[in-house]
Amino acid sequence: MTNINSDSGKINIRTMDQFGLTMQFKINKTTILEKLMSAYCERSGAAIESLEFRLDKQPINKMDTPELLDMEDGDVIEVYQKNTLYS
């Protein structure tokens, strides 16, 4: 039996900053991660230019999708403040 309200194309992703604070997002596997990044910034009040998003220690491109990165339900994206002191 097929569930019409199935979320089979969606996954839950958590973000975690350097202080251990987390946020939960539910997005389609084909949604560009820029949307998640923008939503994170809106919730946290941070400017997207001041942050770096990483998956398994590797930087994430705004145009990447969970599908492209082989992300699974429950994966965690790390969020770091960019070091702008010497840039």
Task: List each model region and its residues.
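Ubiquitin system architectures
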Residues: M1-S87
